[in-house]
Amino acid sequence: MDYLKVLVEEIHSVVVATVDETGHPHTFVMDMMWEDGKTVYFLTADFKPLYKRLKEDERVALTGMTQRAGTMDRKSISLTGQVEWIGKEHLGELLDANPYMYEIYPTEEGRSHLQVFHFKKAVGDFYDLTQLPPYQARFEIEG
């Protein structure tokens, strides 16, 4: 199964956990925007607290699940690992795959603040309740 494709195309929105400089946890909702078969990519604006936290500490955990009618129709993925800031690299691919970003950031100046990250190393857990017994699998990202 292509877990990265499930994460980007079926789940898309996830809750991301980071820690601040004092070790306090923070969570954010964000979209997993693109995958290349090896890793997943996302972006944030350089004026947001999330950007600062990711630049200071690359450790991240996230969880997301598909939004279907009932619990037994859902799949979930959790990732724990390290992200890497890659600046504007692949920004065009992320924007092309997620055209709603042009509504959120309608001007070139607004989009100039967007910064791309990807997982450089992570362990993932996949859980599928659409079949019984539930299917579970572990996978790794070595971006």
Features from the language model and the residues they span:
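A short, aromatic/hydrophobic, helix- or strand-capping loop or linear motif
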Residues: T18-D20, G64-Q67, P106-S112
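Charged, amphipathic alpha-helical segments
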Residues: M1-D2, T44-L50, Y100-E103
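A short, Trp-centered hydrophobic/proline-enriched beta-strand micro-motif
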Residues: V6-E21, V60-G64
